Structure formats: structure tokens, C-alpha cells
Amino acid sequence: FYHNRLDVAQAWYQKLDAFVGEVSQRVENWGGKYNYLIMSDHGFTTYQQKIHLNRWLAENGYLTLNNGSTEGDLSSIDWQKTKAYAVGLNSIYLNVAGREGKGIVGANEIEPLLAEIQQKLMGWNGPDGKSVMQRIRLKHEVYNGAYTRLGPDLVIGYAPGYRASSETGLGKVPQNLIEANHDHWGADHCVDSDVVPGVIFANRDLQNFGGVSFRDIPFLAIGKHLGQSHIKPPSHV
């Protein structure tokens, strides 16, 4: 993850490419027909700026610390005066009454408050004059199923060059808003998903899987129609 060691990434790509070739050759030597898929769930990118998201929430009036403190962590937050908080690298939660232990945001406030925070964050520019955010989505726009309710109220998609700080991930509230990243950890995938798409390689025709996702893996890998490339993916899994 070192900023100045891109040669390491290239070397590993070469090793992995050789490994894939070796596996493919061994399977081919077994004889008969075979299929293989190589997928990743995300890509990778560098980031130069660390975002302290709870500091932004504090400066914009959504989060208040106890006793006039200028920095702290989750235990330092005055929950009776806090409407939103960040914990995790890409998450904002509202302090919802009846859900959080000391929630104050009523049901009728949730939708307009989320829209307000979303709009303000999308208008936030960093030191380079560019937007800090690439995209911000509501939980139901990202997740589906029985556990959607457990997801963050806003899913934060940082723009290229920006990423949440480790302090944000732990729910801390530092004094700074944005900090230059001089850490050895200089790259990962914790930005907007469109910035770091995954990849798929296959030795079969995937023309009917234009928007292929991980939900298609069982259908592609273990079904009785494995060799029938004309079969379309299921509409719902």
C-alpha cells in the first residue's frame, strides 16, 4: 500500500496471472469441458486526503460534544443534542428516537433530515476545489432484503483522492476536518463503488450477463445449465 511502490502491485499482478495460467492448464489437462470464473468484489485506488466525517457533522450542527469539548469519541457525544453521527468508513446514522438508545430524531424528521445532510455533503469541496463526495445514497438504494434496516441511513461514496479517516471508522471526533494522508496505508477500496469496480474474467460467453453481479455466481458456477451460455440470468435471487 506504499504510495511510492507501484512496482509491488505490478509484480503481484504478474504472479497472479501466472497462477491463473497454471490452474487453467491443469484443469484443461483433465480433459473434457470446463468453465472458470475469476471475480473480484472491488478494485483499488490511492487516496491523498483523510476525511473526519464527525467533525463535519459537528461543524454543521448535527453533532454536539459534551461540555463544550472540541474533540472526543462516541462516549463524548451529547446525544440529547445530536441528530447524526458517523461510525464505520462509509456510514452516517441518524440518532433516531426509538432506535438509538438516546434518539431524538422523530419519524417525520428522518426523510427531510437525510435529504438536507445529503445535499450539504454533495456541495462540500476539498482543498483542491473538487467535490469530496462522488455519491451519497439512502440505505434502500444500496441494500435489499430482510436486513436492510440494519444498514447505515446514508451510504457515503467518497470521490477519488478522498477517504474516511480511521478515526471516523471508530466514531471519533478529531479537531481537524480534512487531513493529508501520509500513512503507509495509502490505498484501498473504501470510496464510491463506481470509482473502484471489480472485474470478471471467464472462459465462457457472458453476453447475457451485461450487469453481472455476485448474485449470479450460483447460477453461473453450479447450476445444471453451466455450459449453456444462451441461458439468461434470473431476474431475482
Language-model features, listed with the residues they occupy:
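A general alpha-helical scaffold signature found inside nucleotide-binding enzyme cores
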Residues: 11-18, 52, 216
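Secreted, luminal/periplasmic, and some membrane-associated catalytic domains
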Residues: 22, 27-171
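Non-catalytic, well-ordered alpha-helical segments in soluble enzyme domains
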Residues: 96-127, 204-206, 210-236
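The substrate-binding groove and active-site-proximal loops of carbohydrate-active enzymes
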Residues: 2-14
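A structural signal for the main folded, soluble domain(s) of proteins
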Residues: 19-29, 33, 41, 200-215, ...
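Generic recognition of short, well-ordered alpha-helical segments
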Residues: 4, 48-52, 212
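Low-complexity, glycine/alanine/valine/leucine- and proline-rich hydrophobic stretches
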Residues: 158-218
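A short small-residue
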Residues: 1-3, 97-98
